Amino acid sequence: MNDSVTLRTRKFMTNRLLQRKQMVLDVLHPGKATVPKTEIREKLAKMYKTTPDVVFVFGFKTQFGGGKTTGFAMVYDSLDYAKKNEPKYRLARHGLYEKKKTSRKQRKERKNRMKKVRGTKKASVGAAGKK
């Protein structure tokens, strides 16, 4: 990352309950294209003396005219806390979660089996379909 790119944190908060530091992040990049999230993660990890795998950045919007991008960042104390608290789609972006995909036919068969029963019995029919 170039020296012309600056990271500024706003609204910094240490969230002890979720074992993370969360902040609004301003990326100043005058005359440059939007900075990739991987580079932002690496620079934040260096700032907070941790590894890039526990840094999650998201929700970036570039200001009209460029030069400034604003988003959110979370730095977890450990990878276990990150896996427990981050949504699955964000973990998948980092390569930490793989969704198991059932075939279309299996999904349809399960749906049709569940249509035949009512109420709380649906859970047992749905669980039987997951085997």
UniProtKB/Swiss-Prot annotation:
Keywords: Cytoplasm, Nucleus, Ribonucleoprotein, Ribosomal protein. One of its GO terms (molecular function) is structural constituent of ribosome. GO terms for biological process: ribosomal small subunit biogenesis; translation. Pfam families: Ribosomal_S24e. GO terms for cellular component: cytoplasm; nucleolus; ribosomal subunit; small-subunit processome. It comes from the Eukaryota. Residues 93-131 are annotated as: Disordered. InterPro entries: eRP_eS24_sf (IPR053709), Ribosomal_eS24 (IPR001976), Ribosomal_eS24_CS (IPR018098), Ribosomal_uL23/eL15/eS24_sf (IPR012678). It is found in: Cytoplasm; Nucleus, Nucleolus. Residues 101-121 have a biased composition (Basic residues). Component of the small ribosomal subunit. Part of the small subunit (SSU) processome, composed of more than 70 proteins and the RNA chaperone small nucleolar RNA (snoRNA) U3. Component of the small ribosomal subunit. The ribosome is a large ribonucleoprotein complex responsible for the synthesis of proteins in the cell. Required for processing of pre-rRNA and maturation of 40S ribosomal subunits. Part of the small subunit (SSU) processome, first precursor of the small eukaryotic ribosomal subunit. PANTHER family: 40S RIBOSOMAL PROTEIN S24. Belongs to the eukaryotic ribosomal protein eS24 family. This is Small ribosomal subunit protein eS24. It comes from Ictalurus punctatus.
